[in-house]
Amino acid sequence: MRAWSQLPSDRLLADVSLWSADLANLEPAVRRLSPWADSFHLDAADGHFVPSLLFFPDLIRAIRPHTAVPFHVHLMAEYPSQLATEFLDAGADLLTVHVENGEREAGAAIEQAHRRGCGAGVAVKLDTPVRAVLPYLDAVEVITLLGTEVGVKGCNLAPQAYDRLREARNLLQEHAKRGVRLVADGAIRTHTVPELRAAGADAIVPGSLVFQSADLESTFRWLRSHSVPTVT
């Protein structure tokens, strides 16, 4: 399995959301997408930090043997440091926690990931200032910006999502952190992908866009065709 830092940097990455798969047939879905996905995005939620209850460690452990594609676990929980070890042991290659957890709580989970040789990231809710990522720039490989309300599917992209990506990209440039990847999560559609890429996204989290595709080769060829973003 490859770390996120080893994924290509010259094209848009697809961090495929398994929340949009047929959950009754998760293993076949993983096998079908494995030749194309750069990573699998697994949303894990405790029902408190967000309303949803989502993927749990035993489920991740069960599907881990069926693919070599990296697992990106997006942990939406009030106390991620209490859950991080279970998800890392289950097969997470990259663990993302929220800046809204606070520096102490998020930092503890990030440290657990690094101790196990895994990558770490932070996610930012739509109503949280982008600059909240600043304390974590030396500790993470990935920053995920939510473009919709967290833990909810099927929403339209918030108009400010593009400007937030540009702001994050500029912050990374100002602080010489060009190696940190920016992930756009939420409302990934054919009409939003080009603008998200142009605004600075290194990766997107597609769901129905790929799981409902009748021609995965064409869909992923189109996704990968988007050039390196130029932020203004």
Predicted feature residues:
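Glycine/Thr-rich beta-alpha phosphate-binding loop at enzyme active sites
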Residues: 39, 46-54, 58, 126, ...
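Conserved, mostly hydrophobic/aromatic
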Residues: 26, 33, 43, 87, ...
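N-terminal amphipathic alpha-helix/helix-capping segment at the start of soluble metabolic enzymes
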Residues: 1-20, 27, 232
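Catalytic cores of alpha/beta
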Residues: 28-33, 81-89, 127-139, 188-204
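Hydrophobic faces of well-ordered beta-strands that scaffold small-molecule active sites
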Residues: 12-18, 40-42, 63, 71-75, ...
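Glycine-rich phosphate-binding active-site loops on the catalytic face of alpha/beta enzymes
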Residues: 95-103, 144-156, 199-219
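N-terminal active-site wall of soluble small-molecule enzyme domains
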Residues: 41-112
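Alpha-helix-loop-beta-strand connector modules within alpha/beta enzyme cores
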Residues: 53-74, 112-123, 161-182, 222-232
